[in-house]
């Protein structure tokens, strides 16, 4: 089975899609960069990217998305020297996400402490946020508030592709994760273990649960190429599939129309 970055789920609202670029625009979550981005299918040249910067800035401003610009480049294509020079000159942070996969049978071999892992509901949403908030406060109180509202809205949907889960140990919330199930794959996203619960195999036991849910489907995830988390995934048996460069510019002033 061929796995690609296009198999990775995006919670953002699809604004437009053509052979060149897919645009996600989600005014309800303006501080969630992942939900407001342009994904290139063909690598733009420098002049095209300059024009797209201007177009994205206007589109974002028209929709109340004032904090950033974000672009993702085609899978397995590194921006050339001219593009990298432009990105740095324009104040973009250049990132590199890596796609990993593992067979569900391998995940099921992981061990850890006894946990109760439950889907997030309106009734236990506060437990999810109890783990989420300390790990995300670095992005600001407004981001936490937006995330909580987005989760509440999401949980009220009759059907949803993404299902959040909470892991409890001795009735205390110690871990959170999102699972996106399709016929082909199960994606693991938003995976986090509370600081005080780390180093005891909680994360391994949570992933074993994902392996159980996946049955025969491969499990996929993305990790930052510079993040130490990817080393953990590789030790657990995940294999590298592909990479994708991105460019993020955080804006500190209001965007003019």
What does each model-found stretch correspond to?
Residues 49-57, 190-195, 199-212, 231, ...:
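Conserved acetyl-CoA-binding loop-helix of GNAT-fold acetyltransferases
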Residues 2-6, 43, 106-148, 256-257:
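Short amphipathic alpha-helix that is part of the acyltransferase structural core
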Residues 143-192:
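A conserved beta-strand-loop-helix scaffold within acyl/acetyltransferase catalytic domains
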Residues 63-74, 213-225:
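Conserved GNAT acetyl-CoA-binding A-motif
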Residues 1-63, 78-80, 84, 147-149:
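N-terminal charged segments
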Residues 49-116, 247-249:
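Acyl-donor-binding surface of acyltransferase catalytic domains
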Residues 14-18, 82-93, 161-175:
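Conserved beta-hairpin
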Residues 78-94, 204, 226-243:
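Conserved active-site alpha-helix within GNAT-family acetyltransferase domains
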């Amino acid at each position: 089975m061929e796995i690609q970055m296009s198999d990775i789920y995006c919670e953002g609202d699809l604004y437009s899609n053509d052979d060149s670029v897919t645009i996600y625009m989600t005014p309800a979550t303006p501080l969630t960069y992942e939900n407001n981005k342009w994904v290139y299918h063909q690598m733009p040249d420098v002049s095209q990217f300059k024009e797209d910067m201007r177009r994205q800035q206007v589109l974002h401003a028209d929709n109340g998305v004032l904090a950033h610009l974000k672009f993702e480049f085609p899978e397995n294509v590194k921006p050339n020297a001219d593009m990298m020079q432009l990105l740095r000159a324009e104040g973009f942070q250049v990132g590199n996400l890596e796609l990993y996969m593992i067979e569900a049978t391998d995940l099921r071999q992981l061990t850890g402490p006894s946990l109760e892992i439950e889907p997030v509901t309106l009734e236990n949403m506060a437990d999810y946020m109890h783990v989420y908030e300390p790990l995300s406060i670095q992005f600001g109180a407004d981001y936490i508030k937006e995330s909580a509202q987005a989760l509440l809205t999401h949980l009220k949907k009759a059907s949803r592709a993404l299902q959040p889960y909470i892991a409890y140990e001795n009735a205390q919330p110690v871990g959170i994760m999102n699972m996106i199930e399709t016929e082909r794959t199960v994606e693991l996203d938003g995976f986090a273990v509370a600081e005080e619960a780390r180093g005891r195999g909680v994360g391994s036991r949570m992933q074993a649960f994902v392996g159980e849910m996946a049955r025969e489907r491969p499990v996929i995830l993305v990790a930052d190429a510079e993040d130490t988390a990817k080393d953990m995934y590789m030790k657990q048996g995940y294999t590298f599939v592909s990479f994708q460069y991105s460019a993020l510019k955080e804006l500190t002033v209001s965007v003019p129309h």
